[in-house]
A protein has these predicted regions:
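Ribonuclease/tRNase effector modules and their secretory precursors
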Residues: 1-103
Length: 103
């Protein structure tokens, strides 16, 4: 398991995560809960893909988005995309940009 995935899981398990408005809308439209996303990330054995952010709103020159596809505890495949963020001395938190059922 990668160091990045371990850091993401620790942030999630510590409650250090947030959802963008887009991710919240996707959750609602797919009938998912925040717990479904948390379970999916905790169950993940690998990061599916890491990409560089193309957003003009990014705060750093290099910002990476981590895509995780894994099942929740009921076996439902969930797709999430997010980034690790360092703020105010808190180790990290994971900001979810996209969260929905995997196709």
């Amino acid at each position: 398991m990668s160091d990045t995935l371990v850091r993401i899981k620790r942030a999630i398990l510590s409650g250090h995560y947030a959802f963008s408005e887009k991710a919240s809308l996707e959750l609602e439209s797919d009938g998912l809960t925040e717990l479904d996303i948390v379970e999916s990330i905790v169950n993940a054995v690998a990061i599916y893909k890491t990409i560089r952010s193309q957003s003009p709103y990014r705060k750093q020159v290099r910002e990476y988005l981590h895509i995780i596809q894994s099942t929740n505890l009921e076996g439902l495949m969930v797709y999430s995309k997010g980034k690790l963020v360092q703020e105010a001395g808190i180790e990290t938190y994971y900001f979810l940009i996209s969260s929905k059922k995997a196709v």
